[in-house]
């Protein structure tokens, strides 16, 4: 009987210790990249089966555009233009499709850069600091992301991303090949909500009548 009680006590102590060890496990810390992605509705991306958008660049009287339909779950892309329609799967890219796909990657990046902070596992993300933003001249948080020198269509590029205290992106600086001088500086403005996903439709420079913008955006 004493042996039974002894074994029972040991068993209870083991269960108690196990429960305490399980409850003491720290929660995974959310990275800055994840916080920015979440602020733009990243948790809703898993429900997306198709996204349509037109990428535009307007400067004074000149206009450039290209339209896309992307089915992320199937990894399918449809490039739409006045001349023709190109339908391809991103898992099979040959030399003929490289130019089309590089255009898609560029345009998608502008549209969904907050999510790229999670999707692009090879990037390096700096610690966030607060400093004066280049266009608004207001105090914003800033991180710098850099890409490896090999792989992708534009290896080695860097971006200085400025975001507010709600983790919404407000401006950015693109630095080609991680050079010191900026290649492009634009705003992120005119945010619209598409089924829980927040997208900045307009990106403007500090001077001049230049606007990289998105139209015909549909997310299903």
Question: What are the functions of these language-model segments?
Answer:
Residues 139-220:
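Gly/Pro-enriched, hydrophobic low-complexity segments
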Residues 90-157, 179:
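Flexible, processing/modification-adjacent segments and terminal tails
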Residues 24, 29-98, 123, 129-130, ...:
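N-terminal mature ectodomain segment of secretory-pathway/periplasmic proteins
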Residues 13-16:
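C-terminal motif of bacterial Sec signal peptides marking the signal peptidase cleavage site
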Residues 18-20:
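Bacterial signal peptide processing site
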Residues 10, 46-48, 118:
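A generic structural signal for short, non-catalytic loop/turn and secondary-structure boundary residues
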Residues 2-8:
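Sec-dependent signal peptide recognition
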Residues 45, 70, 109-110, 172, ...:
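Tryptophan-centered motif/residue detector
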